[in-house]
């Protein structure tokens, strides 16, 4: 056996392998550098200022104004309050909103020291624990999509039924972290499969400008306020309907991506049907690309490339 020949062959094979590995490495490095330099850099353009942050813990309930909020994938959060994580349901589990019970918009739900505080006009405040692990989990429906909720108890049910002066029984449910969220793509195909919410109609975050509301209000017989449209983020220092063209936004440490316009059924009162034949689109729904913190007074930047 010629050991020198075997050694020479081994060296030759190692050189070929090294060349192949080195070539692959150069190719990968070249692709990475090419992507880096071919990709257009981001530009941040100032488009407005956050004038209000509003969280709606109870679906169709009264807004709670915030000075600062955490923006999670499923919407705004502040302490024990999370946006649209409580919901009124009928006995069959179907959601009850301001469409069915207009007085629901006057009900306030807040949290303090592990307790939920429920308030409404001409009603005594009702307090009950946020966590009630012994209560049953109810199967509920939001726009035909199944979702669960922890029943908040009989006392709360009696309070709601008395408030609405209803012959039917209403119950309050709470969405808990261990429960499976709704996939918004099941209702709106423009959403990605990974985008999820608890009890909102569709998107995690709704954004609207003061200028758009003022412009619209001037065209209506009875003026409207921002609160009527139930946004989470209200923007000032911009022109009417500028927000309709903001595809990607940076606010504080939060990055938002526009998904679709919001169908504002709230406008369709009998006196306004001469203006709108169907429910108009008003405000913009966003998903959360990057979670973080924002606050009133933060500058809003439009991201372009």
Which residue stretches match the model-derived regions?
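Metal-cofactor-dependent catalytic cores
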Residues: 2-305
């Amino acid at each position: 056996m010629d050991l020198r020949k075997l050694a020479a062959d081994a060296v030759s094979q190692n050189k070929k392998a090294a060349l192949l590995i080195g070539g692959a490495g150069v190719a990968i490095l070249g692709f990475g550098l090419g992507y880096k330099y071919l990709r257009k850099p981001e530009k941040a353009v100032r488009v407005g200022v956050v004038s209000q942050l509003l969280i709606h813990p109870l679906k169709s309930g009264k807004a709670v104004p915030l000075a600062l909020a955490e923006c999670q994938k499923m919407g705004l959060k502040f302490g024990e309050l999370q946006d649209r994580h409580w919901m009124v349901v009928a006995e069959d589990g179907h959601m009850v909103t301001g469409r069915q019970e207009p007085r629901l918009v006057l009900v306030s739900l807040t949290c303090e020291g592990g307790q939920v505080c429920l308030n409404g006009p001409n009603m005594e405040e009702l307090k009950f624990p946020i966590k009630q692990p012994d209560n049953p989990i109810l199967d509920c429906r939001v726009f035909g999509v199944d979702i669960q909720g922890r029943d908040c108890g009989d006392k709360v049910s009696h309070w709601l039924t008395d408030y609405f002066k209803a012959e039917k029984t209403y119950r309050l449910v709470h969405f808990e972290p261990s429960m499976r969220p709704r996939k918004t793509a099941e209702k709106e195909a423009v959403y990605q499969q990974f985008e999820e919410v608890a009890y909102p109609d569709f998107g995690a975050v709704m954004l609207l400008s003061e200028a758009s509301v003022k412009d619209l209000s001037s065209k209506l017989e009875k003026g409207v306020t921002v609160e009527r449209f139930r946004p989470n983020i209200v923007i000032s220092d911009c022109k009417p309907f500028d927000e309709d063209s903001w595809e990607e936004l940076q606010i504080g440490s939060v990055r938002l991506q526009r998904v679709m316009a919001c169908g504002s059924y709230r406008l369709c009162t009998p006196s306004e049907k001469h203006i709108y034949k169907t429910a108009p689109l008003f405000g913009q729904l966003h998903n959360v690309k990057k979670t973080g913190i924002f606050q009133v007074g933060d500058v809003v930047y439009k991201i372009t490339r």
